Regions:
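Conserved phosphate-binding elements of NTP-dependent enzyme cores
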Residues: 1-940
Length: 940
């Protein structure tokens, strides 16, 4: 009997309060609620975790030994579970070899298409390659060389050095009499050899005959022997005209003699030695020594540190060698680098085969010392390739510059792989097309194929079109197959995985998604909802953790977790249909039914009259745009996904300002010039990267408030009597921490073939500190008790300590009152990490001339959280600062003082500034997609 519901009973994970939930199977369910209310705890840490645990329990004990920790979630019972697949936001793949094409497997089908239906061309002459059977070669010779004397040759050596004495002797013993060396036919003699230092072309003479029809059997036999001897390739030499013609069983260019092996899918893979460019090994880029970084100041002498990797003069062999080289050119180590002759610099950098003489008095030997000098570049390269020392590699990396591979020009593949075409494009050109352009190419390319290839390609093209359509449906038309996975945003990588899952056509699966609408313009939201419904209609259950209003209204079922966040959340405040939800009064329902709303400001700020102007920005898809950022305003940059917003702000504006203000090493994308940069004195880029990589990092340590809290405890009477220093109250150093667990508060128990178990430390019971440290108390609370407080509790507790209150109050103001002061940074979402960073900046004194940059700060935020966040940002602008936000959320866009709309499309169809002005001015514009969705929000 099949169950119609997924039933969760007694869920207590994190802040969930023993809740019971029912979710209908084969439906689209949205789990919503305030940030920190417990949505992810229910969806991922309870339902998904239990589904995974049950799946792994079906493995043998031996197989389970190789899998990660799968603890049973704290729940009484879950019934009705299907196999579960989680599609999260995290961009987990940092491998430079992973691309959109490899992730979606579209590139695999492209490789198959080019291997089976591609036409080969010579990369030397550009002519179409041909291949011959032995029968065809015999027929051509009888027709075209009738009555002529010809030599039938097998190529043995092509443009290689060597004396080839053994080869000649081997041919002589096989009974061959003549050989052609560098165009000259010679008799093979005993001991024969050629100049070993020159490149040679060598062919063995298989037969020489007058071509007549009566000799066709002899000709046939000679051609077969020649093909075998020449590995499928032969040459016909016309004795009278002294011209040769090439024939091959393999693909060959008759004019140049160039031949390829039969194409196979691996030949088009940049991850296979058969296809990868030999110079960059399939990466498309190479790391090379940048001489500008090695010698930044040519006015210095080598003795004073002109060559940065070597530093200033030391009594070392490398300096003695360089000095000996310089003396040959009338210079020494004290000569300014700019005055050293070019020949000497070339030897110092690249080395020389000629030995360098070092005077015996320097090396303290009985005679002069002779040694070859390999050069500074070789020295740095050796350090860089030293696998045993990560520190040395990191040190050497600072002198590298990444550039396009000079051999494949960024195409990643060998020359012969790029010489195959389908239609009029090679595989790299196809992979560089936007998905929308690729879709057009796929729909027309079949008509350009030869009849035989058309039949072969039909099924492959059909599969390619299907998979490309799935990417179009989830709003990723602006990406290309060659786009690296590591460069994708969390929302983009999630939607790629969603498209892959739709393409897999699985049924009876439970899919759980985490905010798939992140980074999507309202235009593309409709496509996403359609894709999720398609996944449901295949016969699957889809659970989405989401705050988007359109997604909630399109759902079959809604579970609202609340009423507030943290300890005040963790309850089911509503479960039912969207229609029924509108009749309730939960915080979410109030925003959906119009009882609550974020009000449109009555007046837009005028700013301070100053601005920053960037002219000629042309990074990625930007089309030499000029853009002005009026200061003292809340600026929102809008546009569809892939239109160029992040390129303009994160890759152009932010690096320009950082270079000017802080001498940042990050290079901005190309632009012509910038004006007004002196109108600000500080730039703060608040991104969503983690605030720490280890469980020891937490909001208290990141904001710096933990230092103040430790100082407070050090100055307590009990601490002074005991002579404690601030380090006593740190869980990172010996002294005050619990040594049984090293200040972690827990221990990891290895269970061999069972998953590792994390248990609270039996000595400190999770407190992280030893007994003596915990005896020091402030207002009855130990340092461990303080770290266990939520931000809201800490604000009340430290209300009379101004320096501490200021920092934790800022965390409360950005809507993080529910998280704990000592909560591990690894448990914070990207949105929470971003708000911790924002709170840290808020607690600092601003100058009134600061520019703040935020990329989608509403990620993971409920309507109510957005209202709180925007109140904070509004206060920053009210103090004279400028806030630049990249955002799709209409509640944020309508609050802007100034909008910069980028578009009109994504990818190559974008990159233009299509409208700027107040929300009211942009809303009445006829350009782009933003006005259509903004008008109703403003009541226009």
């Amino acid at each position: 009997m099949t169950q119609d519901w997924i039933t969760v009973e007694g869920a207590r994970v994190h802040n969930l309060k023993n809740i019971d939930v029912k979710i209908p199977r084969n439906s689209l369910t949205v789990i919503t609620g305030l940030s920190g209310s417990g949505k992810s705890s229910l969806a991922f840490d309870t339902i998904y975790a239990e589904g995974q645990r049950r799946y792994i329990d079906t493995f043998s004990a031996y197989a389970r030994n190789f899998l990660g920790n799968m603890e049973r979630p704290d729940v009484d019972k879950i019934s009705g579970l299907s196999p579960v697949i989680s599609i999260e936001q995290k961009t987990t793949n940092k491998n430079p070899r992973s691309t959109v094409g490899t992730t979606t497997e579209i590139y695999d089908y492209l490789r198959l298409l080019f291997a089976r239906a591609g036409t080969a061309y010579s990369y030397v002459t550009g002519e179409k390659m041909v291949k011959y059977t032995e029968e065809k070669v015999v027929g051509l010779i009888l027709d075209e060389y009738a009555g002529k004397k010809v030599f039938i040759l097998s190529p043995l050596v092509r443009q290689r050095k060597g004396h080839y004495r053994e080869l000649f002797e081997s041919m002589r013993r096989k009974g061959y009499l003549y050989i052609r060396v560098d165009g000259e036919v010679k008799e093979i003699t005993r001991g024969m050899k050629v100049d070993r230092y020159k490149n040679h072309n060598i062919e063995i003479v298989i037969d020489k005959l007058m071509v007549e029809p009566k000799d066709d059997e002899r000709l046939r036999h000679s051609i077969a022997t020649a093909m075998k001897q020449g590995d499928g390739t032969i040459m016909i030499l016309d004795k009278d005209s002294d011209t040769t013609r090439n024939f091959s069983k393999r693909l060959m260019d008759p004019a140049s003699g160039l031949s390829y092996g039969d194409p196979a899918p691996n030949m088009f893979s940049f991850n296979s030695p058969e296809g990868a460019c030999p110079r960059c090994h399939g990466l498309g880029i190479v790391d090379e020594i940048d001489l500008k970084k090695v010698i930044p100041n040519q006015n210095l002498s080598i003795r004073d540190g002109a060559i940065v990797p070597l530093g200033k003069y030391k009594n070392q062999m490398i300096f003695w060698q360089i000095d000996a080289i310089l003396q040959k050119y009338g210079c020494d180590l004290k000569t300014p680098y700019k005055d050293i002759p070019d020949e000497a610099i070339d030897t110092i950098m690249n080395g020389s085969l000629e030995s360098v003489r070092i005077d015996k008095s320097i090396v303290h030997t009985s005679s002069d010392y002779f040694v070859t000098f390999e050069g500074v570049i070789k020295y740095l390269t050796d350090v860089m390739n030293d696998d045993d020392s990560a520190a040395s590699q990191k040190w050497a990396a600072q002198f590298l510059a990444t550039s396009e591979c000079p051999e494949c020009h960024g195409n990643r593949l060998k020359k012969e792989s790029l010489a195959f075409k389908v239609g009029d494009k090679n595989i790299s050109e196809v992979a560089n097309l936007d998905i929308s352009e690729l879709n057009e190419w796929l729909s027309t390319v079949e008509d350009k194929l030869e009849p035989q290839n058309k039949k072969i390609a039909h099924e492959i093209l059909k599969e390619l079109k299907t998979r490309v359509n799935f990417l179009l449906e989830v709003g990723l038309d602006y990406l290309s197959l060659n786009r690296q996975s590591a460069s994708l945003s969390g929302g983009e990588s999630q939607r790629i995985r969603l498209a892959t899952q739709i393409g897999s056509q699985l049924v009876n699966v439970l899919y759980i998604l985490d905010e798939p609408s992140i980074g999507l313009h309202q235009r593309d939201n409709e496509k996403l909802i359609r894709s999720l419904k398609e996944l449901r209609d295949l016969g699957n259950t889809v659970i989405v953790v989401e705050h988007d209003e359109d997604m909630m209204r399109a759902a079959d079922w809604i579970v609202d977790i609340g009423p507030k966040a943290g300890r005040k959340g963790g309850e089911v405040v509503f479960e039912g249909t969207p229609k029924d939800m509108l009749k309730t009064h939960t915080i979410t329902a109030q925003y959906l039914n119009g009882e609550s709303r974020i009000a449109v400001p009555a007046v837009r700020r005028q700013g301070n009259g100053k601005s920053i102007k960037i002219m000629g920005a042309c990074g990625n898809n930007l089309k030499h745009v000029d853009v002005e950022f009026p200061l003292g305003k809340l600026i929102v940059v809008t546009g569809v996904s892939g239109s160029g917003k992040s390129t303009l702000i994160n890759e152009t504006l932010a690096p320009i300002l950082s270079q000017h203000l802080y001498r940042s090493l990050k290079k901005p994308m190309p632009y012509d010039k910038v004006e007004g940069i002196d109108n600000i004195d500080k730039v703060v880029n608040v991104d969503q990267s983690p605030i720490g990589r280890t469980p020891r990092s937490n909001p208290a340590t990141y904001t710096g408030v933990f230092t103040d809290i430790r100082s407070l405890f050090v100055n307590l009477p009990e601490a002074k009597i005991r002579g404690y220093k601030p380090g006593r109250f740190s869980f990172n150093v010996k002294g005050g921490r619990c040594e049984a667990c090293g200040g972690n508060g827990y221990k990891v128990i290895e269970m061999n073939f069972l998953p590792n178990v994390t248990v609270p430390c039996e000595v400190c019971h999770g407190k992280r500190y030893n007994r003596e440290t915990l005896e020091v108390r402030y207002k009855g609370k130990s340092i461990a008790d303080v770290l266990d407080m939520t931000i809201n509790q800490a604000v009340e507790f430290f209300e009379n300590v101004p320096n501490i209150l200021q920092k934790i109050k800022s965390l409360q103001e950005v809507g993080l009152g529910y998280i704990k002061l000592g909560q591990s940074s690894t448990t914070l979402s990207g949105g929470e990490s971003q708000r911790v960073k924002l709170a840290t900046e808020l607690s600092k004194r601003d100058t009134g001339k600061t520019l703040y940059i935020l990329d989608e700060p509403t990620t993971g935020l409920h309507f109510e959280d957005i209202r709180i966040l925007m109140d904070v940002l509004e206060k920053l602008v009210d103090r004279g600062n400028t806030v630049v936000i990249i955002e799709h959320n209409l509640d944020v866009i309508k609050l802007a003082d100034w909008i910069i709309d980028v578009g009109p499309e994504g990818g190559r169809g974008g990159g233009q500034i299509i409208s700027t002005g107040t929300p009211e001015q942009v809303a009445v514009s006829s350009k782009g997609y933003t006005p259509r969705f903004l008008k109703p929000m403003l009541g226009i």
